[in-house]
């Protein structure tokens, strides 16, 4: 008599099967400390692309992480000596009709350790919150395993967000799916680059050399932050980028500013005037043709911009800005036009080393961000032509005495190697829709769709050489200080990233 009653009671209540997201979250919660210990080990390795010995230590460590997850990794080398290798692995799914390749990069920006607050770039620590919000170091020696993990804690270290977080989230998502026995619907490939922050100068070489291995229907890119509102976002393009060094000249030796001021030209003034003339008061670039070849946004892209959260006023408050550029356009709109930025400017000395002299030279590094339709070679040529129109004799080396005697204004202009164009994928493609649905399934709020990221990635190199499409799914907190001192990742963003990539690996 008891059994039928129990059966009836059981049938009277709904039975809920765990979703993929719930299973992945269960795995993560059970393995938080092992995952974090593994991540701290990776973050403790210096990872500037020019440091070949340490960059290869990073690659070796990532290979070990892959092996522990049942993958068979290998290094993809370029033919150029001392090039940082890419780390590659794949997982074949029987019967799969689609191949997804997950991209992140393991190198980081150079940094000055003296600029970090109480910590060093490659000595990761937990803080209770962002430094700007009064976050305190949990323990200089690292918290004990018994300490409850607060998802609002942040890990401070170089590349904690950009972009070792991508490596960690992707590999942890794969581990969770495998541990929980969740079937994949696609062949999965992993590609972790080692010199993205150096401009990916050898990515084309690596891709061409290993073209068959890197073939995929879609490259899913993990790099960059979520929207400033905190919502998850899917980004369908990235700006191109190229960097240019500009140097102008005055007297051949430093001159006493009292004896020679008002007579000898000051190169700092010369360069300041030249650079200031390149933009108007609203920040619009005045160089001829700068915007002429921009490819217009389509209806879907314009709708996505209109639907995105309006966050400019809040950003102005956070950043202490009363006035911004752009002539009244939103940040989201301005990301989709080419820009010209001064990365750095130098002439003479300041601070304790300041002297009453007229310097001999002044130098600046310019950052040209490109959008779909721009060509990086054409854009840099426009810059050179503009400098010539301002009366400068342009060369690509140090001037000779004869040139100094002949030309009153001389500018050395050098375009740095590794420039690349912008790329953008249509938002209405079937794979685009599938990615949007997968990411949305893991988010409590409506996700943000961006036609183009403000940051740059070498997506055009990928699409041009492999005839594939790229879609970016960033996971880092927007206030992560990427490229700057005190870089950090909020733990909840890392945890959310694991669930997001698990959803992408199981799209139908």
Task: Give the location of each predicted region.
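Short amphipathic alpha-helical face segments that pack within enzyme cores
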Residues: 165-176, 270-273, 434, 461, ...
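Acidic/histidine-rich catalytic neighborhood of metal-dependent amide-processing enzymes
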Residues: 147-237, 310
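Short, conserved micro-motifs enriched in small and acidic residues
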Residues: 3, 153-168, 261, 265, ...
């Amino acid at each position: 008599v008891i059994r039928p009653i129990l059966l009836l009671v059981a049938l009277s209540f709904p039975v809920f099967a765990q979703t993929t997201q719930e299973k992945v979250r269960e795995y993560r919660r059970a393995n938080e400390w092992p995952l974090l210990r593994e991540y701290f080990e990776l973050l403790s390795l210096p990872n500037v692309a020019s440091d070949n010995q340490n960059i290869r230590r990073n690659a070796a460590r990532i290979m070990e992480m892959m092996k522990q997850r049942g993958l068979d990794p290998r290094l993809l080398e370029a033919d150029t000596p001392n090039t940082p290798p890419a780390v590659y692995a794949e997982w074949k799914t029987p019967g799969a009709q689609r191949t997804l390749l997950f991209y992140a990069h393991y190198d980081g920006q150079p940094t000055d350790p003296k600029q970090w607050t109480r910590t060093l770039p490659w000595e990761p620590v937990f803080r209770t919150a962002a430094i700007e919000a009064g976050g305190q170091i949990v323990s200089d020696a690292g918290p004990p395993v018994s300490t409850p993990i607060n998802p609002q804690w942040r890990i401070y270290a170089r590349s904690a967000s950009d972009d070792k977080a991508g490596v960690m989230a992707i590999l942890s998502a794969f581990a969770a799916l495998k541990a929980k026995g969740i079937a994949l619907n696609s062949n999965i490939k992993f590609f972790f680059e080692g010199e993205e922050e150096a401009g990916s100068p050898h990515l084309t070489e690596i891709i061409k050399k290993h073209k068959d291995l890197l073939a995929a229907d879609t490259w899913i890119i993990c790099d960059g932050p979520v929207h400033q509102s905190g919502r998850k976002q899917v980004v369908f393009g990235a700006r191109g980028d190229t960097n240019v060094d500009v140097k102008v000249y005055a007297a051949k030796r430093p001159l006493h500013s009292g004896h020679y001021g008002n007579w000898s030209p000051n190169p700092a003034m010369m360069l300041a005037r030249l650079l200031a003339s390149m933009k108007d008061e609203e920040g619009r670039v005045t160089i001829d043709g700068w915007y002429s070849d921009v490819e217009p946004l389509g209806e879907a892209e314009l709708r996505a911009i209109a639907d995105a959260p309006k966050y400019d006023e809040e950003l102005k408050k956070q950043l202490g800005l009363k006035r911004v550029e752009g002539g009244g356009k939103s940040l989201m709109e301005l990301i989709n036009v080419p820009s010209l930025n001064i990365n750095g400017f130098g002439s003479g000395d300041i601070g304790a080393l300041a002297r009453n002299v007229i310097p001999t030279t002044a130098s600046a590094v310019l950052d040209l961000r490109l959008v779909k339709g721009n060509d990086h070679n054409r854009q840099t040529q426009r810059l050179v032509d503009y400098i010539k129109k301002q009366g400068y004799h342009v060369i690509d080396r140090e001037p000779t005495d004869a040139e100094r005697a002949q030309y009153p204004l001389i500018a050395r202009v050098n375009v740095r190697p590794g420039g690349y164009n912008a790329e953008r994928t249509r938002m209405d493609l079937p794979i685009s829709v599938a990615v949007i649905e997968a990411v949305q399934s893991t988010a409590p709020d409506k996700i943000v769709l961006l036609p183009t990221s403000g940051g740059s990635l070498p997506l055009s190199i990928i699409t041009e050489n492999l005839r594939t499409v790229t879609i970016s799914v960033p996971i880092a907190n927007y206030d992560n200080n990427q490229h700057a001192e005190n870089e950090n990742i909020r733990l909840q963003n890392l945890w959310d990233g694991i669930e997001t990539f698990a959803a992408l690996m199981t799209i139908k």
